[in-house]
């Protein structure tokens, strides 16, 4: 990154439109799920032999981490999401817009984080609805925001390997 300040058009902030699309799609899907599906296992919709739509509340983080706590975790995870969103937006402002890979990764994480924060602040929980399973083993239910966060993080990790390989050549 150069020392010269980038304009908004030149910087990765241009890619925040993707975060907005992810956020709007996430809350839109969650709205449909909350208003059209019954809550819980008995109301699941079997789609494929390994996939259900299932409306559940997650009071914790990934894998329902800390979901059994008294409620303080809601604000902890909200605070973490705000800090991460701020840092990633700052980094995007320093990255040239042409560095698509990292800007897309950051925008995906921001969109997902803001989608889940919206749920935490408005509802007190995150709405999850995707249930993948094999036999009797079910992966923890998740949502579009979770997928965006994970894919963005995977892109950042892959970029770290990609840059090392390029440096060796």
Swiss-Prot record:
One of its GO terms (molecular function) is aspartic-type endopeptidase activity. Disulfide bonds: none annotated. Pathway: Protein modification; lipoprotein biosynthesis (signal peptide cleavage). Its EC number is 3.4.23.36. It holds the Pfam family Peptidase_A8. The active site is at 128, 146. It comes from the Bacteria. Coiled coil: none annotated. It is an enzyme of class 3 (hydrolase). GO terms for biological process: proteolysis. It is found in: Cell inner membrane. Its main location: membrane. It catalyses: Release of signal peptides from bacterial membrane prolipoproteins. Hydrolyzes -Xaa-Yaa-Zaa-|-(S,diacylglyceryl)Cys-, in which Xaa is hydrophobic (preferably Leu), and Yaa (Ala or Ser) and Zaa (Gly or Ala) have small, neutral side chains. One of its GO terms (cellular component) is plasma membrane. The chain crosses the membrane at residues 15-35, 47-67, 75-95, 107-127, 141-161. Belongs to the peptidase A8 family. This is Lipoprotein signal peptidase. It comes from Vibrio parahaemolyticus serotype O3:K6 (strain RIMD 2210633). The gene is lspA.
């Amino acid at each position: 990154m150069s020392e010269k300040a980038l304009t908004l058009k030149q910087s990765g902030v241009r890619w925040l439109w993707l975060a907005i699309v992810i956020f709007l799609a996430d809350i839109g899907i969650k709205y449909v799920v909350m208003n059209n599906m019954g809550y819980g296992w008995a109301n699941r919709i079997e789609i494929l032999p390994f996939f259900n739509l299932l409306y559940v509340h997650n009071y914790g983080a990934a894998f329902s981490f800390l979901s059994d706590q008294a409620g303080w975790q809601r604000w902890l995870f909200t605070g973490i999401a705000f800090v991460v969103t701020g840092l990633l937006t700052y980094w995007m402002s320093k990255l040239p817009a042409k560095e698509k890979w990292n800007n897309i990764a950051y925008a995906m994480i921001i969109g997902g984080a803001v989608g889940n924060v919206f749920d935490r602040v408005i509802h007190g929980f995150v709405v999850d609805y995707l249930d993948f399973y094999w036999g009797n083993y079910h992966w923890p239910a998740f949502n579009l925001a979770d997928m965006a966060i994970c894919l963005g993080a995977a892109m950042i990790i892959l970029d770290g390997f990609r840059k090392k390989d390029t440096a060796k050549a």
